UniProtKB/Swiss-Prot annotation:
NCBIfam families (alphabetical): ureG (TIGR00101)
Gene Ontology cellular component terms for the protein in this record: cytoplasm
The protein's name in its UniProt record: Urease accessory protein UreG
Assembly description: Homodimer. UreD, UreF and UreG form a complex that acts as a GTP-hydrolysis-dependent molecular chaperone, activating the urease apoprotein by helping to assemble the nickel containing metallocenter of UreC. The UreE protein probably delivers the nickel.
Gene Ontology MF terms: GTP binding; GTPase activity; nickel cation binding
Binding-site residues for GTP, renumbered to this chain: G11, P12, V13, G14, S15, G16, K17, T18
Source species of the chain: Prochlorococcus marinus (strain MIT 9312)
Cellular localization per UniProt: Cytoplasm
Keyword hit for Transmembrane: no
Keywords of the record: Chaperone, Cytoplasm, GTP-binding, Nickel insertion, Nucleotide-binding
Isomerase in keyword set: no
HAMAP family per record: UreG
Gene it is expressed from: ureG
GO biological process: urea catabolic process
Family that this chain belongs to: Belongs to the SIMIBI class G3E GTPase family. UreG subfamily.
Length: 203
């Protein structure tokens, strides 16, 4: 492997996965070598969004059209994504981070250990405060859970205290953060977490 850390980013449609990648690329690229793989079923919309935002040079972003279930493309048959990651690692070695964004999926989404070293799962407050207690691999087993769009809590009647309590119960000590990626809340904490996971940076 010619990248130090492959990071999977998953979560339901509209939760903020692409916004997370945009934010992380902009905050990390001055100090680290980064590349990104995005997944969409029939288009390369997320890749084009990141390219148009100029978060990285165009060659460092690859869009994968999965043509089917987002979960299958990151778990059962991850060959398309694996090939895209290897392509980027061969083109831009050595890389510090390769981010792999799954297409929008449900709470059962999880990455193959052959594809990524760790996973981030993103949910958002607008789906309701019951989401953390519904469980699923994304909630309970991801290496980092993000509860995004906390600014919408009052508008959708979501109780952040309930979400906090349920998340702490479901996560059993695993890290998680409240975030508002549009204003930068939580970005520093996410960045520190990722930096701590780089093999050479671990104590």
């Amino acid at each position: 492997m010619s990248s130090k850390l492959r990071v999977g980013v998953a979560g339901p449609v509209g939760s903020g996965k692409t916004a997370l990648l945009e934010t992380l690329c902009l905050s990390l690229k001055n100090n680290y070598e980064i590349a990104v793989v995005t997944n969409d079923i029939y288009t390369k919309e997320d890749a084009n969004f990141l390219i148009n935002k100029k978060v990285l040079e165009e060659g460092r972003i690859i869009g994968v059209e999965t043509g089917g279930c987002p979960h299958t493309a990151i778990r059962e048959d991850c060959s398309l994504n694996k090939n895209a990651v290897l392509d980027l690692e061969n083109r831009y070695k050595p890389l510090d981070f390769v981010f792999v964004e799954s297409g929008g999926d449900n709470l059962a989404s999880s990455f193959s250990p052959e594809l990524v070293d760790l996973s981030i799962y993103v949910i958002d407050v607008s789906a309701g405060d019951k989401i953390p207690r519904k469980g699923g691999p994304g909630i309970t087993r991801s290496d980092l859970l993000l509860i995004n769009k906390i600014d919408l809590a009052d508008m959708v009647g979501a109780n952040l205290n309930i979400m906090k309590s349920d998340t702490e119960f479901m996560r059993k000590g695993k890290p998680w953060f409240f975030t508002n990626l549009s204003t930068g809340i939580g970005v520093e904490e996410i960045t520190r977490f990722l930096e701590s996971q780089i093999p050479n940076n671990q104590n």
